[in-house]
Structure formats: C-alpha cells, structure tokens
C-alpha cells in the first residue's frame, strides 16, 4: 500500500492501495500537494486488477484508477512534465514471474501519454516511431530544463534507446548498442541531467554516461577491476536539480555520493540496508555471528566485545564472496566453516588466513545434471562433525568435510520437465541467472536427538524423511492437510527434545497465495497439526523456531514481521 507522513517522516499513516502489492513510482503535483499519481507495478507472481496508475486529489483519502491495461500489466515508469503537471508519460509493462520461469513483455506493454491529468490517454506506437511488436520494460526520463526532450529505454525484439524532441509526440531510435544497458527486466533506468538535456545516465550493472544526447555512452562506473568503493548493480539514481555534479547512487551494496560528477565517490556506511538470508553462531565465548548477504558475500563478527565503544565495523570480516546464503561454522573449530553462494556453490573457509576452496558436490555420472536452488540446502550432522549434507535434487553426503561426496537419495523432487526450462527464461530478453532453478531441495534438517534421522523439503512441495542416514526414504507430503500442492518448503526444524517431532514452514506467495502455513508433527510425519493460519499473522511464513528451554515459546518469521 501507500503511506503518508505529515511530519517529515517521524510517523506514517496508511492511505490505501494495499492490494496493489508493489508500487513503483509516486509523483506529487508541484502545484497541489493533495494531487498525487501512483504507478502500481503490481505483483509479478500473479494476475490481479489492482495495478496501473492511480490518482488522488484529496491527499490520499480516496483514489481513482485512471490507467489500466490488463491484470498482468503494471507501471514500469512514470514521468511528469515539470512545466505542465497535467502532462504525464507512463510506461506500462506486461510481465509474469513463476517460481521456475520469468517472462518480460507482451501485448499489454506500451507507452501512454495524457495532457489532462489522466482523464484521457493516447497510446504511443510504431506510428510515433517506437518499435513494432511486443514491448517489455521501458524506462523514461524527461529533461526538466527542456521538457520537450524525453528519453525512453525500450525492451523489444531489439533493445534500444529512443528520444523525443517534441514532448513525446514523435520518437527516433538513437542507440541500440550494448552500452545502453543490460538485463532490462532488472534495470531499465535512465536519467537526464536537469541542467544539461544531452547528459544522460544509464544505470544498470555499470553506470554509463552520454554527453551527446544518448548517441554514445562511456563507462562512468565500472563494475569490476576498480577500487572506488562503489558496488555494481545500480537501481536508484538522483541528480541535484541545480548542480549536476552532485549525485546519489543506490546500488546492491548501499548508497554512494559524488560531488564531482562521478570522479570520486563516498560510501554512506551508517545505513543498515544489508539483506541477510540466514544467520548462525559458533561455540566461541563471546560467540560470533555469521550471515550471508544478498550480493554482498558472507560475513563473520562478534556478538559483543570486552572493549569500550562496542562493536566496530572493522571487527567484521568477509569470509566468502558472491550472493551469501547459509554459513555453517565448524562446531569443533570455528576457525573453519562452510559458506554458500548462488548456483549451489559452497566453500570451506579459514577465516584466519583468508583461504578457502570449493567443496561443491559434482554430478554422480556424466549424464546427470545437478539442479541447485538459488538458496540451496546445507546441513551439519550433529553427531559427527566430519559429516555434511548438501541438496540438489538429491541429498549429497560428505564424511570428510566436503572433500568427497556421495549421493544418498533418489531425486526427491517432482522432476517436472516443464519446470526445468530456465535456459529459455526471460521473455523478450533471455535471463538465466539460476534464480528460477526449480525442482530442487530447499532444506536438509538432521535431527539433534536421533542419529541418522534426516528431514528434507523441496521447492515443489515434497517432504521426505530418512531414519537410516539416507538408505531409505519415506514421503509424508500427502499427510500435510491443507498444504497447497507445489508449495515451497523453506524450513523444517527438528525437535531438540523428542524423536519424530518437527516443525515445518511452507509458503506459496510465488503463485500469488499469501496465506501463512506452519505445521507440527510428533509421529514422524504420519499426521500434522496446523499451528498458524491467516487469522494469526498478516503475511506468508518464512521461518519458525522453538525456544530450547520452553517448548511453549515459539517465534515465527513472516514477510510482515516477527511473531
């Protein structure tokens, strides 16, 4: 939904539009602060009508939907003419994401323009100079100093940068080279200097700048091989309205500021914006905290210190690179451990020397292709710390800390071939990063009270257990009443007291089902008791934990917060 603050951000009030799920742009009429335009991109996971452009003229008390195409098309970008607040250009984007596939583009995508505050709209097509056929995501930028100059970064059969010199009535393709950007579904952001209509920034993995109105670009910020303190993968950009040398960059590593047009950058280090997938601790005293961060590696730091001034940034150490996920410190010697990254990579590290090496399982034969989830499964055997488990579509077991592996299960997923076409994913522009890998194992949970007892959950809704270290497996999916077929099973927590007892979390939001799901079994999955539903919490479930001393005290992590 959308929130409003009347005290400079100290407090916020919900003003509606909750069902839009995702809002991409908000524009306030500079002549009337009660008139606001909202560009709702909607949920990528499902079709729903609460998307498009909404308008309020009473400060958010009521809303009118003024532009709608269809229930799978939302607003990718929206700009207002700074000299005429009734003139707005909107990029509509048809897209759909499934757990196993992504499609950008379709007949719903297009560019629209209004001159009367949204009462009437004109769709701009190939007649105005835009590309023919289906379009994908479109990024827009208007030159505030000369608002007749408008740029459109268009995903199409051939991605290109288009320019209008008459306020959007006609368009010309000016650049279709690789320097305009990559991965349009993920980026497609373009910005123009308010003081120089020919200085254009394309913001993507790199940041490129044009000084000739987009005809050519040079690299302003390389992604790799430089030490400027700026993380690659850029998603937000701000240019000072009267000083084009002053810019702010928002990227996958945080926020950076330049005062000299991008020659030097200062990292803003006091914003807590890191995204941790998992958190773990070791057995030291004081203990250390470990975690893997989205696109920012895996880290280790003290929970507390016996020093004045507390924990400093310098006390934290990066122990592995990439998209960080689970970190498993060695219970016997926390100098060593395992850190995961995307595509199922796992490394054994030595944080004292900084050395590490890959211990990722390899296929059991030449004909088998392993499928690893973006956030793959790892488990440490609580009875034998030499033993490690790792998940692809199989359970892999190592008894020598990852040096060698054996497969100890059949394919525990549905192995649905229709959900294994990631090489075709992306829509108009192919995009196969591994984020849509499917029919994979999500969780491997060894029991801390029963040797050789393993629980396994998958991303296509299957739950198995083995009581003999993987020699045989029993599926209990059908016993979980109310579990939607094909749901994700991101967590199973085996009881620390009782054999055969476990907690299970499932979610199905990737298919536009935001219902919370959690169950408990006390008899090895023969029956399950549902312990949370929509009447208890506000959003889908992600994790669950039982207090080790008081079994009646439980914690539930949801997309909405902690319960």
Predicted regions and their residues:
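Beta-propeller blade termini and top-face loops
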Residues: 1-563
């Amino acid at each position: 939904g959308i929130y409003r603050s009347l005290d400079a951000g100290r407090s916020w009030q919900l003003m509606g539009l909750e069902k839009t799920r995702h809002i991409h742009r908000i524009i306030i009429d500079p002549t009337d602060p009660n008139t606001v335009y909202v560009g709702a991109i909607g949920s990528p996971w499902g079709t729903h009508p609460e998307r498009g452009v909404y308008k309020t003229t009473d400060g958010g008390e009521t809303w009118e939907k003024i532009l709608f195409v269809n229930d799978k098309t939302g607003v990718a970008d929206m700009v207002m003419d700074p000299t005429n607040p009734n003139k707005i250009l909107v990029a509509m984007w048809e897209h759909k994401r499934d757990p196993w596939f992504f499609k950008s583009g379709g007949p719903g995508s297009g560019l629209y323009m209004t001159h009367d505050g949204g009462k009437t709209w004109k769709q701009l097509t190939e007649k105005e100079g835009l590309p023919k056929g289906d379009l994908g995501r479109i990024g827009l930028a208007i030159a505030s100093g000369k608002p007749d100059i408008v740029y459109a970064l268009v995903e199409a059969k051939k991605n290109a940068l288009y320019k209008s010199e008459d306020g959007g009535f006609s368009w010309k393709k000016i650049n279709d080279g690789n320097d305009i950007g990559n991965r349009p579904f993920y980026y497609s952001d373009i910005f123009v200097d308010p003081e120089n209509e020919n200085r254009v920034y394309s913001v993507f993995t790199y940041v490129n700048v044009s000084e000739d109105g987009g005809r050519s670009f040079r690299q302003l910020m390389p992604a790799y091989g430089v030490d400027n303190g700026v993380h690659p993968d850029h998603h937000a950009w701000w240019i000072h309205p009267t000083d084009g040398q002053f810019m702010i960059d928002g990227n996958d590593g945080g926020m950076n500021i330049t005062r000299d047009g991008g020659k030097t950058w200062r990292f803003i280090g006091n914003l807590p914006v890191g995204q941790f997938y998992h958190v773990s601790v070791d057995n030291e005293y004081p203990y250390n905290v470990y975690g893997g961060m989205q696109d920012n590696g895996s880290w280790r730091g003290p929970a507390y210190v016996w020093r004045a001034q507390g924990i400093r940034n310098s006390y934290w150490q990066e122990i592995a690179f990439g998209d960080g996920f689970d970190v498993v410190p060695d219970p016997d010697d926390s100098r060593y451990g395992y850190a995961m990254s995307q595509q199922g990579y796992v490394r054994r590290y030595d944080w004292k020397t900084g050395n590490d090496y890959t211990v990722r399982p390899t296929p059991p034969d030449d004909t088998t292709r392993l499928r690893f989830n973006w956030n793959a499964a790892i488990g440490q055997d609580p009875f034998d710390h030499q033993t490690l488990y790792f998940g692809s579509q199989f359970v892999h077991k190592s008894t020598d800390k990852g040096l060698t592996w054996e497969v100890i299960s059949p394919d525990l997923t549905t192995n649905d071939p229709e959900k294994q076409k990631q090489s075709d994913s992306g829509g108009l522009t192919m995009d196969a990063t591994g984020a849509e890998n499917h029919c994979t194992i999500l969780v491997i949970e060894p029991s801390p009270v029963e040797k050789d007892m393993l629980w396994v959950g998958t991303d296509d809704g299957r739950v198995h257990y083995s009581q003999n270290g993987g020699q045989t497996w029993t599926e209990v999916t059908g016993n979980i009443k109310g579990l939607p077929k094909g749901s994700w099973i991101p967590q199973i927590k085996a009881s620390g007291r009782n054999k055969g007892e476990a907690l299970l979390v499932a979610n199905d939001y990737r298919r536009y089902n935001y219902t919370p799901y959690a169950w408990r079994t006390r008899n090895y999955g023969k029956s399950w008791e549902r312990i949370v539903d929509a009447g208890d919490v506000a959003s889908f479930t992600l994790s669950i934990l039982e207090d080790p001393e008081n079994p009646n005290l439980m914690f539930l992590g949801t997309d909405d917060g902690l319960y």
